[in-house]
């Protein structure tokens, strides 16, 4: 597993790591960026990422809540792998049609795993968790591919959400720099 994990980390890094000047969702500026659309649009890489996420799905959840936009392909493929239904959470309700915040069915009474792509401060996880809870869902867990280590784990915990990442920024950088990504699991 360690070698497979190292290889996957290196693939994610080489596919999606960019350098330059980037403004993050949190408003922070960074000199590097993980372009999640690069790994989410590669079917083989996305499949391997999701296969690595499957064992991280906590027991007791009965639905996956993919956050707009990057969490949607992850939740869709994770749904196909686990058999759990997927729900798609908008940043704000549509202003036409069903005018729903959450698509895919009623989440009232469901125990949902929030699925996100890249997390820095967990701001969107917190907002979406609050929205899902207002719709009657129970949310105690979130899962992401990359934790940029910007305090998101602590912010999510303060909201009562345990956030797990497939990789931290440090692990991805280690896969590039030292050819290894430590296995935290």
Q: Predicted segments — roles?
A:
Residues 35, 114-116, 121-122, 141:
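Thr-Gly-centered strand-to-loop micro-motif
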Residues 1-56:
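Active-site-facing substrate-recognition patch
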Residues 74-113, 121-127, 179-184:
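Short, glycine/charge-rich flexible loops or terminal/linker lids adjacent to PRPP-binding catalytic cores
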Residues 60-70, 143-144:
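Short glycine-rich phosphate-binding loop at a beta-alpha junction
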Residues 51-62, 129-135:
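Phosphate/pyrophosphate-binding loops at sites that engage ATP/ADP/AMP, CoA/4′-phosphopantetheine
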């Amino acid at each position: 597993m360690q070698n497979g994990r190292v290889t996957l980390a290196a693939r994610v890094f080489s596919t999606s790591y960019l350098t330059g000047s980037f403004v993050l969702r949190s408003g922070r500026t960074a000199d590097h960026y993980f372009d999640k659309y690069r790994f989410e649009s590669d079917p083989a890489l996305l499949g391997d990422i999701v296969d690595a996420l499957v064992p991280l799905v906590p027991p007791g959840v009965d639905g996956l809540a993919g956050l707009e936009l990057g969490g949607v392909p992850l939740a869709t493929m994770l749904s196909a792998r686990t058999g759990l239904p997927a729900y798609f959470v908008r940043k704000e309700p549509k202003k036409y049609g069903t005018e729903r915040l959450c698509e895919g069915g009623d989440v009232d009474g469901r125990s949902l795993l929030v699925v996100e792509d890249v997390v820095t401060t967990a701001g969107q996880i917190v907002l979406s968790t609050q929205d899902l809870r207002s719709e009657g869902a129970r949310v105690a867990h979130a899962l992401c591919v990359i934790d940029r280590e910007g305090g998101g784990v602590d912010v999510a915990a303060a909201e009562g959400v345990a956030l797990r990442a497939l990789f931290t920024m440090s692990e991805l950088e280690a896969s590039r720099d030292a050819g290894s990504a430590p296995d935290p699991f």
